[in-house]
């Protein structure tokens, strides 16, 4: 079941850079993941990811879906790229639109599968849970909300980009799965670790990602005076971990008024034709520098799961960005999100059939009521985004986080009537956004240690952005 009716509604579609593999050498890959996380990732989870990476990509993406990854030079079958904080070339890619090229054949495969039914335009608005057990979900479609019973329920609902003013996520990324799981009593973890991508172009007000692969190819960041600012900040300069680069970009933007990505050191149009076309469609000429700012990109936390995707509730699984597997810790290494979703998806898929199908109850379907007025919805989202941008963004203060919690609790109370049992999906979606925003703010307030994506500072502090 997916609330979207378009492939672009899935986060996978939007992934650009690529998918990392171990190349038969998982130990250095594991070290890179742990280093990028400031040694906050779960070593057992990282080991699962790196040990299963090659087989998962080969068996599913290459042998089953026939994803045509870019070839290397001199007849090499693959062009392995390198991105920030990777110590080796290990990233498979298709131009700079890898997610789309994975997602399209995946949907085609599912469409032909005799045991898969895709219900699009169908939103999950709540879980059927009691006594620590999930028995299915309540699904809304065509003006009706009805229970669907299942031995296992797998959440793969993506991220939380809609909670921020600028994001690289699809518009529907309101954290629905995390909110439903939390309301049902599932454990969440690491919710304060919201990763901001350092290079997002919003030239015409419509954000679009400039892949990390561009910096891996040699692009550099310059301020409004044309000066590079990353070399003094970190030894790896533009290829430092994302949290470091994002804060440095924000500082440089505040200091000089603009930051551009200079791609003049290589043939950008030939190397990244999809990105060239995307820039041109937004009125940006890459040859003169691509204006960039940080924007919300990825939630490293989520529904706490084990190495099989099992949550704290019996019968409930989570995979992908809505899950907190422990792989990322405080900061995600580039090009590991597609891999995490693939590996945990396979493992959850193998474990989920082991649950007994629950008996259906006599609960009846209900007709949905009228949705909130469009201006009511827009006003609520505007308030959520303003709160999160100001107080729960790249740099946070204890006072700001306290104000954010107060404001979000007030808003949640106002929104609650719009999420009644017979409310249409947009009301439940808004409630989910409020729920998850508050989870992020509360987790951030409880963690006084600056690490990775979570950077806490005193008001007015202008210290070194890599102090965390």
What are these regions (language model features)?
Residues 36-79:
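Rossmann-like flavin
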Residues 152-208, 338, 342-344:
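Glycine-rich loop(s) and the adjacent beta-strand/alpha-helix scaffold that form part
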Residues 44-54, 89-108, 119, 167-175, ...:
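Short beta-strand to alpha-helix junction loop
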Residues 7, 14-16, 59, 68-81, ...:
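Glycine- and aromatic-enriched mobile tails/lids
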């Amino acid at each position: 079941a997916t609330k979207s009716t378009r492939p672009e509604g899935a986060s996978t579609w939007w992934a650009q850079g690529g998918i990392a593999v171990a190349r038969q050498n998982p130990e250095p890959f594991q070290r890179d993941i742990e280093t990028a996380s400031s040694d906050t990732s779960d070593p057992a989870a990282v080991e699962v990811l790196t040990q299963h990476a090659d087989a998962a990509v080969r068996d599913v993406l290459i042998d089953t879906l026939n994803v045509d990854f870019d070839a290397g030079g001199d007849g090499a079958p693959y062009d392995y790229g390198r991105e920030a904080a990777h110590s080796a070339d290990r990233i498979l890619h298709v131009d700079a639109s890898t997610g789309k090229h994975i997602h399209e054949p995946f949907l085609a495969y599912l469409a032909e599968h005799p045991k898969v039914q895709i219900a699009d335009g169908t939103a999950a608005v709540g879980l059927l849970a009691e006594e620590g057990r999930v028995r299915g979900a309540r699904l809304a479609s065509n003006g009706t909300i009805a229970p669907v019973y299942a031995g296992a329920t797998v959440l793969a609902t993506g991220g939380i980009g809609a909670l921020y003013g600028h994001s690289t996520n699809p518009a529907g990324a309101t954290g629905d799965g995390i909110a439903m799981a939390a309301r049902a009593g599932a454990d969440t973890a690491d919710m304060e670790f919201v990763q901001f991508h350092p290079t997002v172009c919003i030239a015409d007000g419509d954000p679009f990602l400039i892949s990390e692969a561009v910096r891996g190819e040699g692009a550099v960041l310059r301020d409004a005076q044309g000066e590079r600012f990353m070399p003094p900040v970190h030894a790896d300069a533009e290829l430092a971990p994302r949290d470091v680069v994002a804060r440095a970009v924000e500082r440089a933007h505040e200091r000089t008024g603009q930051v551009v990505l200079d791609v003049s050191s290589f043939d950008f149009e030939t190397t990244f034709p999809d990105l060239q076309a995307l820039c041109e469609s937004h009125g940006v000429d890459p040859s003169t520098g691509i204006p960039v700012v940080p924007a919300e990109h990825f939630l490293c936390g989520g529904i706490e799961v084990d190495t099989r995707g099992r949550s704290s509730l019996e019968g409930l699984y989570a995979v992908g960005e809505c899950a907190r597997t422990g792989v990322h810790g405080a900061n995600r290494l580039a090009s590991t999100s597609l891999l995490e979703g693939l590996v945990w998806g396979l493992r959850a898929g193998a474990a989920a059939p082991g649950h007994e199908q629950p008996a259906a109850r006599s609960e009846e379907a209900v007709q949905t009521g009228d949705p909130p007025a469009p201006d009511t919805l827009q006003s609520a989202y505007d308030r959520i985004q303003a709160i999160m941008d100001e107080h729960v963004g790249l740099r946070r203060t204890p006072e700001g986080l306290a104000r954010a919690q107060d404001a979000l609790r007030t808003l949640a109370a106002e929104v609650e009537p719009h999420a009644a049992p017979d409310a249409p999906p947009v009301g439940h979606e808004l409630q989910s956004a409020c729920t998850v925003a508050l989870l992020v703010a509360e987790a951030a307030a409880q963690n006084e240690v600056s690490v990775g994506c979570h950077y806490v500072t005193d008001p007015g502090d202008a210290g070194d952005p890599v102090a965390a």
